[in-house]
UniProtKB/Swiss-Prot annotation:
GO function terms (MF aspect): ATP binding; ATP hydrolysis activity
Major localization listed first in the record, in broad terms: nucleus
GO terms under biological process: cell division; protein transport
Family classification: Belongs to the AAA ATPase family.
Keywords: Acetylation, ATP-binding, Cell cycle, Cell division, Cytoplasm, Cytoskeleton, Nucleotide-binding, Nucleus, Phosphoprotein, Protein transport, Repeat, Transport
Sites of Phosphoserine modification: 41
Cellular location(s): Nucleus; Cytoplasm, Cytoskeleton, Phragmoplast
Protein name: Cell division control protein 48 homolog E
Gene3D superfamilies on file: 1.10.8.60, 2.40.40.20, 3.10.330.10, 6.10.20.150, P-loop containing nucleotide triphosphate hydrolases (3.40.50.300)
Amino acid sequence: MSNEPESSDSKTKKDFSTAILERKKSPNRLVVDEAINDDNSVVSLHPTTMEKLQLFRGDTILIKGKKRKDTVCIALADETCEEPKIRMNKVVRSNLRVRLGDVISVHQCPDVKYGKRVHILPVDDTVEGVTGNLFDAYLKPYFLEAYRPVRKGDLFLVRGGMRSVEFKVIETDPAEYCVVAPDTEIFCEGEPVKREDEERLDEVGYDDVGGVRKQMAQIRELVELPLRHPQLFKSIGVKPPKGILLYGPPGSGKTLIARAVANETGAFFFCINGPEIMSKLAGESESNLRKAFEEAEKNAPSIIFIDEIDSIAPKREKTNGEVERRIVSQLLTLMDGLKSRAHVIVMGATNRPNSIDPALRRFGRFDREIDIGVPDEIGRLEVLRIHTKNMKLAEDVDLERISKDTHGYVGADLAALCTEAALQCIREKMDVIDLEDDSIDAEILNSMAVSNEHFHTALGNSNPSALRETVVEVPNVSWEDIGGLENVKRELQETVQYPVEHPEKFEKFGMSPSKGVLFYGPPGCGKTLLAKAIANECQANFISVKGPELLTMWFGESEANVREIFDKARQSAPCVLFFDELDSIATQRGNSAGDAGGAADRVLNQLLTEMDGMNAKKTVFIIGATNRPDIIDSALLRPGRLDQLIYIPLPDEDSRLNIFKACLRKSPVAKDVDVTALAKYTQGFSGADITEICQRACKYAIRENIEKDIENERRRSQNPEAMEEDMVDDEVSEIRAAHFEESMKYARRSVSDADIRKYQAFAQTLQQSRGFGSEFRFDSTAGVGRTTGVAAADPFATSAAAADDDDLYS
């Protein structure tokens, strides 16, 4: 966790809680370092540190680690050890659940008694195939004359003979800690301990939750303070909070946070899964709830965690079932009846906070609602670091870059991304892995590492879970695929890419970026293609909305669809919302009588309010495309909604040349094809028409190629002895001029001159209505102002003059 100084005016309590996150400085807090001598019972400290803590060489000390784990060791002085560090080997570290660089605390532990009896068992996977008496071979030499302190529940590794065996201390008598002296009895009867049971104890702690620093501070302040130090609230004279409601999109880590809190506080954790309480017998569901709360009160301090709380506490007026209503009432009375200092805290988690009964959301029941949202870039980096800490990563993996590219991903999506990258790594090694073999070569296992390439492949295959149903393959269209339209490209980059890639520039100049763009122009000029390219070039998420799909037959559902789409876009910001055929849902209001009770009007109103309500914080862009700009409602075209109106004209000669080149980029074209001549000849053709010409020429080439193949086959079958040279050898391997000539016979223009005049008239009226005052200049006294004024007036002048041509941007 980063160590940010809180601003002085923030609440002291908040300050205190982030101080929970940052460790207090204290002489007995030491940083874990790798041991030099590999002894399981010894830790070494610098002599000065030992002096400060009043320890002597050979003292038994108690060390506290993470997840409420502790163990006992013998302290030795070591000059080479740095002062604030403590050296311990891997065994001690795993007992304390810490890694190198973590902080542990050291305490004096003077009254460690000699043990009468200890019960020690081996761990099953380390004793496979070990024959003979374990006690004589391993334990006796390990404990002989060593006076080792042990702690119940610890694991330790003993090296002996050919291999190492891991043991677990099952029971110690008389206390949890004791020293194994020569007269201590050691029992090692019983079945070996299963490794799985051990691993399961290694549950999640605060270190395993990333990207929710602020929320974590709030939760710890609401949960740990009342459970650990109830006297704080008593002395101030307020009641501690009783309930916390966590809400947020699925996969953002609500249940994980609750688990981590339970493990780290050491409180009794009672988990209620919403649907499990239900029972078919009358009154049984309520009694299940009551039992859970009674159990928690008995074992106080405790945390009751209700997962998916919306399933057992829905709004009472909306539910038909009697049982649900009774359960909600029971939950309300139970939460009120929790004695204020019973040290029971109720946590609820849901991803639909608005479907919960409002009576539950008042103060005194769920006092605090905490939004566990989609993490930002720093949060995503934290989550990625947590998920990759046990992965074997190659040198070139750049987690920061990956966290930049994963907009809108929640924790679960990032976990899936890491898994997918690892799978990708395994797939590459599949040729050397034999599934039938019992074991895999250690060499192969060691050579595996997840590289940056694997992460990139995984990024291509995964998408944020918020966008699963409106999933859009981000199209593989780049700027190179689009011929011409240079001005439009630049305008688009400024509108969409700058706010995503340089947000700090907008802050510096104190303006929020513009939100919307409308492309209009004749069909087949690349409006949709441009939207695809911008989605691909700038690493934003892309949701494509087909206008007509929003309308449904149910009353009120069409508007709900619009709301839902905007919610999704906000969740996975930065996001480009692309409305294709905008005219189908944004026709002028008032003239749509008779269609589904004015559904189109209501959808438009919803659209307008959504566009105004888009928070400036979230970078969501709207791109509309239409070829009927004249029928779009004028309220939608005002600045602040779709403020950039971009006319995408028929391509001029240069653009046509570029389009031909872009279309034929991947095709083998003969030398005798003069693309410039084609571009000259296709005056008035749209981009789609030009693509069609290329496709047709390509088709003719393929047809000829296949005919040649058939001819060769026929000859071969008639005359098997014929030499290869006699075959028809002029193989058609490229598109020749003849193919284009043939193709041009069928070429046609899809946009008539009358249509173009309509678009130009519309563009001109816009230009005139907006070009008012285009000759504006500042007073000539200000020398600097004058030049900028001229520059500002320029674009209008040129575009108005060029309006007669078929290309407004010539």
